[in-house]
């Protein structure tokens, strides 16, 4: 018994020493950001609303300040709330905060191997290669503008064939936007009646709805439990696997038909790069990273822009007076005959302001795509341990009431000077900022402007309900804000 007592005492002493050493190490490094007390397993789930995480984080920022800690289940997250801290972290200390954090659902779907979710040297090499190669295949150049103009023409013709029948434009918009990124990464566009592509559009559309389900939100808190439970989150995962297979099959077909001397698209260029690095055991260019990067580019090049355009049509058919003013500007600068082009935008301050306000108002990614610190980091007066998940809240910037008075109201005046000229704002960062800024920002801006002005050049938007009953409030999900379902008639002008 005495030996057992001595052993117990020694064990307690050792544990105490370890706890003291841990406390001393942390105290020397500095205090971590404050936050609500977290409970075992559930973290702060009882103190926040998983149905509306951005709203809960806003309320916590009012109590704990612009830098605070919250626990999503067992996952610790440091939240950055407000323009100053977001800019300071992502730009001024951009390297420290350049890691890609991952919520459980994102990790489940993307596996951390493509350009969006990878880290370290893999991410650096893939991003550098993607930016160079996408430019080589026209992104940001005159060639891609002409492709968008051509696709806008196909979209307009398709809308004319609806003969003013009320419809949900979601599928049409996804198809048009997808064809732009498809022409770059796959080397060709898809016909609007292509059955395999229509199935792909259906999976994407369904997932846009499924991610609003509470089960999808809860997956980010309790992934292990949710993996075993039935529900819409399981269908979301299965649909994603189908989209993954669609892009992987195209990659496999490219392998069979590759002509190294004449690369047709991004996939061919990547396959050539793989061949060049064949003898390099540490090469980041593998068939796995090609498949994941292709999927990343396809989804990123489709999702953000098509959903923004869905929001745009929803918002604008609520405000016919705004549409009328845009159409006057379109008729004056572009006319009814030729296609809109990016060079027109500088002469169309009201239209430019409306597009900026749409992106600001919808706040597409309220918590941003999560970041992580790549090393132990001193930020302001706080210590943030390496690999800590970071939420740089874009909603806190896009809905800042000092920069944008009455931010919850849709108002193009947020981007107009008193004399009607366009007003820039440093707070406009729907594509994020810093080292992880969206690689396709330029392409997305071009698509949104050309597609939207082409639609308004040719059609008046006719609602199927009274204007005052049109709900433009975004539906909040754990990953992105989504528009309500709606129908609208496209009446030729």
What are these regions (language model features)?
Residues 1-28, 179:
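Terminal signal-anchor or tail-anchor transmembrane helices
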Residues 29-147, 168-169, 173-183, 196-225, ...:
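Cytochrome P450 substrate-recognition site 1
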Residues 32-37, 79-89, 96-98, 187-198, ...:
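Classical protein tyrosine phosphatase
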Residues 45-58, 62-65, 242-249, 339-381, ...:
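Conserved cytochrome P450 K-helix E-x-x-R motif and the immediately C-terminal K′/meander segment
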Residues 99-107, 141-309, 325, 475:
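Cytochrome P450 heme-thiolate monooxygenase catalytic core
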Residues 320-322, 441-479:
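Cytochrome P450 heme-binding "Cys pocket" and the immediately downstream C-terminal segment
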Residues 380, 418-448, 474-475:
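Cytochrome P450 heme-thiolate "Cys pocket" and heme-binding signature region
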Residues 392-420:
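Conserved cytochrome P450 K-helix/beta-meander segment immediately N-terminal to the heme-binding cysteine loop
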């Amino acid at each position: 018994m005495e030996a057992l007592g001595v052993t117990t005492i020694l064990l307690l002493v050792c544990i105490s020493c370890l706890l003291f050493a841990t406390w001393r190490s942390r105290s020397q490094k500095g205090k971590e950001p404050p936050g609500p007390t977290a409970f075992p397993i559930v973290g702060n789930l009882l103190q926040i609303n998983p149905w509306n995480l951005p709203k809960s984080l806003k309320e916590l920022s009012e109590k704990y300040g612009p830098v605070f800690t919250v626990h999503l289940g067992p996952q610790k997250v440091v939240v950055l709330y407000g323009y100053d801290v977001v800019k300071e972290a992502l730009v001024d200390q951009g390297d420290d905060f350049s890691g890609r954090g991952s919520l459980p659902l994102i990790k489940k779907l993307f596996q951390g191997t493509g350009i969006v979710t990878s880290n370290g040297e893999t991410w650096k090499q893939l991003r550098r290669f993607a930016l160079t190669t996408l430019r080589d295949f026209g992104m940001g150049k005159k060639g891609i503008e002409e492709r968008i103009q051509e696709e806008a023409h196909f979209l307009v013709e398709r809308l004319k064939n609806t003969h003013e029948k009320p419809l949900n434009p979601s599928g049409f918009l996804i198809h048009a936007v997808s064809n732009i990124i498809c022409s770059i990464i796959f080397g060709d566009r898809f016909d609007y009646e292509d059955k395999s592509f229509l199935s792909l559009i259906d999976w994407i559309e369904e997932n846009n709805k499924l991610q609003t389900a509470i089960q999808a939100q809860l997956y980010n808190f309790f992934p292990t439990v949710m993996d075993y439970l039935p529900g819409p989150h399981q269908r979301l995962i299965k649909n994603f696997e189908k989209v993954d297979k669609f892009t992987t099959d195209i990659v496999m077909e490219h392998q069979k038909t590759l002509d190294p001397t004449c690369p047709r698209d991004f996939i061919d260029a990547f396959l050539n790069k793989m061949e060049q690095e064949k003898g390099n055991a540490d090469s980041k260019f593998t068939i796995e990273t090609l498949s994941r990067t292709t999927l990343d580019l396809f989804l990123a090049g489709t999702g953000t822009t098509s959903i923004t355009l869905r929001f745009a049509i929803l918002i604008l058919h609520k405000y016919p007076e705004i549409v009328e003013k845009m159409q006057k500007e379109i008729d004056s600068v572009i006319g009814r005959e030729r296609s809109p082009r990016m060079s027109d935008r500088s002469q169309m301050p009201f239209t430019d302001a409306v597009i900026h306000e749409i992106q600001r108002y919808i706040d597409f990614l309220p918590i941003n795509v999560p970041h992580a610190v790549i090393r132990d980091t001193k930020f302001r007066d706080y210590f943030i341990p390496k690999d800590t998940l970071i939420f740089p809240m874009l909603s806190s910037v896009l809905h800042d009431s000092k920069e944008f008075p009455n931010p919850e109201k849709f108002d193009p005046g947020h981007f107009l000077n008193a004399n009607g000229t366009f007003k820039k704002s440093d707070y406009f960062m729907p594509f994020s900022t810093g080292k992880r800024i969206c690689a396709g920002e330029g392409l997305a801006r071009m698509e949104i402007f050309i597609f939207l002005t082409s639609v308004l050049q040719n059609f008046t938007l006719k609602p199927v309900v009274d204007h005052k009953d049109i709900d433009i409030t975004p539906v909040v999900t754990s990953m992105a804000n989504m528009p309500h379902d709606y129908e609208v008639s496209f009446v030729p002008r």
